[in-house]
Amino acid sequence: MTTTIELADLPQLSQISDLAHSIWRDYYLGIISRPQIEFMLAADYSLDQLEKDRATGTNFLILKENGQAIGFAAFHTLNPSVVKLDKLYLETQHHRKGYGQRLLQATERAATEDAASLLLLNVNKHNVRAIAAYRRAGYSHHQSILAPIGYGFFVDDYVL
């Protein structure tokens, strides 16, 4: 099997949108409610929103296995020394193959190329599999946040 990670171009944002919708509906049910999943997908993963994110400095990486998109990451610079990992998602059937770690490492490399000394990320407090993966990669709990995102929904995250 051949896997590649590449900087996503504008046409690949539609693949990222499709992946996000599939992954979130499969993975997050049981962590957050279906209405919150649909709200967050509409707010953050529409093609229009992804294009706006890219136009304002968000970088997208796309992970492919044998040419097929199976995961992605997105990150942006907060300030000259800090990069924020906004998104890192992988199709569930590809978990536990090291692909998530490869996406994380690719993001870390991109951050250091930009001279950042810190990579921050948020993870839902109930996403125990992702928390464990980030801890294995050396990340630790920095702070907790509970913030409204609209329509009665909240993010309940750890910042690592």
Give the positions of each predicted feature.
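Acetyl-CoA-dependent GNAT
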Residues: 3, 7-13, 17-93, 101-110, ...
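C-terminal "cap" of GNAT-fold acetyltransferases
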Residues: 51, 83, 117-131, 135-137, ...
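Short glycine-rich hinge loops at helix-strand junctions in the catalytic core
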Residues: 98, 115, 138
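Substrate-recognition "cap/lid" segment bordering the active-site pocket of phosphatases
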Residues: 96, 105, 132
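Active-site acidic-Proline motif in GNAT/NAT acetyltransferases
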Residues: 91-93, 97, 125-126
